[in-house]
UniProtKB/Swiss-Prot annotation:
The active site is at 126 (n6-amp-lysine intermediate). This is DNA ligase. Pfam families: BRCT, DNA_ligase_aden, DNA_ligase_OB, DNA_ligase_ZBD, HHH_2. It catalyses: NAD(+) + (deoxyribonucleotide)n-3'-hydroxyl + 5'-phospho-(deoxyribonucleotide)m = (deoxyribonucleotide)n+m + AMP + beta-nicotinamide D-nucleotide. Zn(2+) binds at residues 419, 422, 437, 443. It comes from the Bacteria. SUPFAM superfamilies: BRCT domain, DNA ligase/mRNA capping enzyme, catalytic domain, Nucleic acid-binding proteins, RuvA domain 2-like. DNA ligase that catalyzes the formation of phosphodiester linkages between 5'-phosphoryl and 3'-hydroxyl groups in double-stranded DNA using NAD as a coenzyme and as the energy source for the reaction. It is essential for DNA replication and repair of damaged DNA. The gene is ligA. Residues 612-695 form the BRCT domain. One of its GO terms (cellular component) is cytosol.
């Protein structure tokens, strides 16, 4: 369903689905080097998420994909924290989208039309490889890391030292400390050579050059990496102890002087027309390039403006990726299956005759929900047009009209009103698009999915308890509730005798389980699988309530509509009324309270959540009022949030600081009445570490 057609309840459900699917795709791409979709699919999924959030801004989730970069560092390598985060880029798919990006940047900076038209951008082909960060101290290469989750990545220094495109010493003067960002990739000829060697050795070939590059760089043996002809294009800086250029274009020239390879196709563009012309040129030349690209990156050239624009969520405001369109194909729909998720959602999945789409064999596609099937009038036996454009499995765009001599179409699909797994009644609440099984924890599918979620990477993260093991243990009666996981050590001897197990593997499982009997509160909350509670929401709750005991006490009181605790819960930034309702509903169910009691009896500690401060304004509530003259209101808000503050629009007893611009008005008077600290704009700049404006 098009975002413009969604009701608010439908949008809420869709945003939850999108957050889960994008998180799964991110793990496959960043952590496993095994993407399950093309970049076009992934981009379309993110674009759908952004479109819904734009229409319903109050529904944006704290764990929204628009706010985060996913992909945790692998335990196989050491971890290292980036001095400046390595975030992702937002995407556009046409000139109109690009012009909107320019308009947003200009508005944020407070530029007039003439100034906006004067903005220069550097255009660089977007290499489809693995992003890395190279750290140099006094010109000497000391560390190389992958992007990871954007905050910390895998230390692959030894492997990067084998690349000829990575200077071990920078040529000429350089800052005492600098991070240089680049993209590691395999040329098409190198990819073919590696796959030929893989086939000759009887090993599985890589699916594409990006997978091969990532797999080559993440070898535990640097000698293997050295035998792979990896290349690198340098394209940006992270942290730098000294400014080495005033524009991004000049910085690229400095990279060349230091000994890096910079993409020779990069250029400066000075208008949307020029940006579109460069995009068209690259699209024409794409097939003849020796490396894979999936679009063009455009960056504001002025580095001072980049600093002012900063970041929003997971992406910089000063750069955008203009992506190539998605790929499509036609195949036949053979049947429609219904899958049951951990919250009981019944999701229809189209089973297709295998078809090649962009080099990937597709056999399944999402149908989303009952309304989507009816809107597209999709029936078994139809020829359908599919697109790999954003879901864990591709989506069906529509039915190919049958020819005059085609046989009659099949019957219209009737969505089941009972669960296909447990037979319980399914219901679809008014205003929602999803049918849900009412079987709850009596439904085997929901139980298994909840157990899988409970031990997932962002929850208890228990090694040795994968999807297959949980399914088998549940079928044999070993696992029925989350607390049963912590009783598994009592069955170690029996587990050791199971097929595929042994004494060592059973002992390792016991050790993994016992190691997780102390768990941070945020992980514990996320593991419970409460609807609409993602990792970020869980961290917000953990930070706000501090301990499990306090959180549970407040949630029980919040079950009363209109109570102070319910209102306080809904007022937490990033939570809101809808999520507060889900939390209250969870704590109103007796079996959920029994589960909590069972778990807390098994766990030794789930308190003392250690959540580090973000800056010297961390935990403070700030209000801006009046007209600011040296920066726009969005810019001031972004600076405050980067320093850890919460920015609100109203003054209350909980406000810590009010920044007064010109014509401050009633908020200034209220701050004075409440005895709240105030600062003028100059004082704010000093507090924020920005310094005075000009001479």
């Amino acid at each position: 369903m098009d975002p413009s057609e969604l009701t608010e309840p439908q949008a809420m459900v869709e945003l939850e689905r999108l957050a889960q699917q994008i998180r799964a795709l991110d793990r496959a791409y960043y952590e496993d080097d095994a993407p399950t979709v093309t970049d076009a699919e992934y981009d379309a999924l993110r674009q759908r998420n952004l479109a819904i959030e734009a229409r319903f801004p109050d529904l944006r989730r704290a764990d929204s994909p628009s706010l985060h970069v996913s992909g945790a560092p692998s335990a196989a390598f050491g971890r290292h924290r980036h001095l400046v985060p390595m975030l992702s880029l937002d995407n556009v798919f046409g000139r109109e989208d690009f012009e909107s990006f320019v308009t947003r940047a200009a508005r944020f900076l407070g530029l007039n039309d003439d100034q906006a038209r004067a903005l220069r951008f550097v255009a660089e082909p977007k290499i489809d490889g693995l992003s890395i960060s190279l750290t140099y101290e006094h010109g000497r290469f000391v560390r190389g890391t992958t992007r990871g989750d954007g905050t910390e990545g895998e230390d692959v220094t030894a492997n990067l030292r084998t690349l000829r495109d990575v200077p071990l010493r920078l040529k000429g003067p350089a800052p005492a400390l600098i991070e240089i960002r680049g993209e590691v990739f395999l040329s098409k000829p190198a990819f073919l050579s590696i796959n030929a060697a893989q086939a000759e050795a009887g090993q599985k070939p890589f699916a594409n050059p990006r997978n091969a590059a990532a797999g080559s760089l993440r070898q535990l043996d640097p000698n293997i990496t050295a035998r792979r002809p990896l290349s690198l294009f340098a394209y940006a800086q992270g942290f730098s102890s000294d400014r080495v250029a005033d524009t991004h274009w000049d910085y690229l020239e400095r990279l060349r002087q230091w000994g890096f390879t910079v993409n020779p196709l990069s250029c400066v563009v000075e208008s949307a027309e020029a940006a579109e012309a460069f995009m068209d040129r690259i699209a024409r030349e794409r097939s003849g390039l020796e490396y894979d690209i999936d679009g063009v990156v455009y960056k504001v050239d002025d580095l001072a403006l980049q600093d002012r624009l900063g970041f929003v969520g997971r992406a910089p405001r000063w750069a955008i990726a203009w992506k190539f369109p998605a790929e499509q194909a036609i195949t036949r729909l053979t049947r429609i299956d219904i899958q049951v998720g951990r919250t009981g959602a019944l999701t229809p999945v189209a089973i297709l005759e295998p078809v090649n789409v962009g080099g990937v064999i597709v056999t399944r596609a999402t149908l989303h929900n009952e309304d989507e099937i009816a809107r597209k009038d999709v029936r078994v036996g139809d020829l359908v047009q599919i697109q790999r454009a954003g879901d864990v499995i591709p989506q069906i765009l529509g039915v190919v009209p049958p020819g005059a001599d085609a046989p009659p179409r099949g019957e219209a699909f009737i969505f089941p009103h009972t669960c296909p797994i447990c037979g319980a009644r399914a219901e679809r609440p008014p205003g929602e698009v999803v049918w849900r099984c009412t079987g709850g924890l009596t439904c085997p599918a929901q139980v298994v999915e909840r157990l899988i979620h409970f031990v997932s990477r962002d929850a208890f993260d228990i090694d040795g308890l994968g999807e297959r093991t949980i399914t088998e243990f549940h079928a044999d009666g070993l696992l029925k509730t989350p607390a049963d996981i912590f009783r598994l050590p009592d069955h170690e001897a029996d587990i050791a005798t199971r097929e595929g197990w042994g004494t060592v593997s059973a002992r390792n499982l016991t050790a993994s389980v016992r190691a997780r009997q102390t768990i941070p509160l945020a992980r514990f909350i996320y593991a419970l699988g409460i609807r609409r509670i993602g990792t970020s929401n869980a961290r917000l709750l953990a930070r706000h309530y501090g301990s499990y005991t306090h959180w549970r006490e407040q949630m029980l009181r919040a079950t009363t509509i209109g109570s102070d605790e319910r209102l306080a819960l809904g007022s937490i930034t990033g939570i809101g009324g809808a999520i507060a309702d889900e939390l209250a509903a969870f704590f109103m169910e007796a079996h959920n309270l029994e589960t909590l009691d069972d778990l807390t009896a098994m766990l030794t500690a789930i308190e003392d959540e250690d959540l580090p401060a973000q800056g010297h304004l961390s935990g403070k509530t700030v209000v801006f009022t009046g007209t600011l003259t040296t920066m726009t209101r969005p810019e001031a808000k972004a600076i405050a949030e980067r320093l850890g503050a919460r920015v609100t629009d109203s003054v209350s007893k909980k406000t810590d600081l009010v920044v007064l611009g010109a014509d401050a008005g009633s908020k200034a008077r209220k701050a004075a009445e409440l005895g709240i600290d105030t600062l003028d704009e100059e004082g704010w700049r000093e507090l924020a570490g920005i310094g005075p404006v000009g001479p």
